[in-house]
Amino acid sequence: MPGWRLLAQGGAQVLGGGAGGLGAAPGLGSRKNILFVVRNLHSKSSTWWDEHLSEENVSFVKQLVSDENKAQLTSLLNPLKDEPWPLHPWEPGSSRVGLIALKLGMMPLWTKDGQKHAVTLLQVQDCHVLKYTPKEDHNGKTATLTVGGKTGSRLYKANSILEFYRDLGLPPKQTTKIFHVTDNAVIKQGTPLYAAHFRPGQYVDVTAKTIGKGFQGVMKRWGFKGQPASHGQTKTHRRPGAISTGDIARVWPGTKMPGKMGNQNRTVYGLKVWRVNTKHNIIYVNGSVGHRNCLVKIKDSTLPAYKDLGKSLPFPTYFPDGDEEELPEDLYDESVRQPSDPSITFA
């Protein structure tokens, strides 16, 4: 039932108009159309349809959707479905596509010289190329590839979005990211992406959403020192102090002040890849990025010191059925001490 009801009638016929009624005619020959807007305050709010399903029906629907997703992924990997796009060699200045991965957690890792490093485990789950946009339709400089990561629920997706994934033959994704690529690194829509896209020893840039802290003061948000704790100070202990001067009579944009902290996308540059597990599609990245169970964006590092490392990487991406020989289950950097190596040796 709509929240607003529109009533439009004329003259004395509105709301039982009569001689003394609300809609009484003003006079002979002066009948006018009067517009009334009445708000309905007792309408029932809408609910999601699955709230009224039983537990057996919910499990049945989830199993049905899971089977359909597996069937779509299996049909997509059929090499006879259509012709692949031509592949081009790597050139200086080439830019590859990136990945979307799920943060599983953190663990320690040791190098052969005994140094300990904290690494983040990022798992690539159902990552596919969704859309190719040529540079003529983007900004005239670089083309883009839209990548989707981690299969999501289709129960709350709009019909237009479901139709887009249905045309691709893929299940709907939980999130999508856009990567700028060069013309020689273009990949066909529907191509699956694996953790072997990155190799141990290279450096990557990781973008993730920081943990939200809510509304915080300047001491926690920006690390301000604060005001003195005593000696005549009253109610100013954690305040920022002066935010401007009197002669300019304004506060400059960008002044550090209290506000919402966290819950923003932040990029960490130049993180080393220590290990790659090809069986479970897990990338071991140096440092801490994102929070647990969050989706992160990984791409080749754009720092000038690492721009020429791409010539030793699979280009434009790793193909399991390509010319490259079969990879082992675990790939390690040459400086990492593998878990199977003995920790103590005797001469």
From Swiss-Prot:
Residues 1-40 form a transit peptide. Residues 337-347 have a biased composition (Polar residues). Its main location: mitochondrion. Residues 317-347 are annotated as: Disordered. PROSITE patterns: RIBOSOMAL_L3 (PS00474). Belongs to the universal ribosomal protein uL3 family. PANTHER family: 50S RIBOSOMAL PROTEIN L3, LARGE RIBOSOMAL SUBUNIT PROTEIN UL3M. This is Large ribosomal subunit protein uL3m. It comes from Rattus norvegicus.
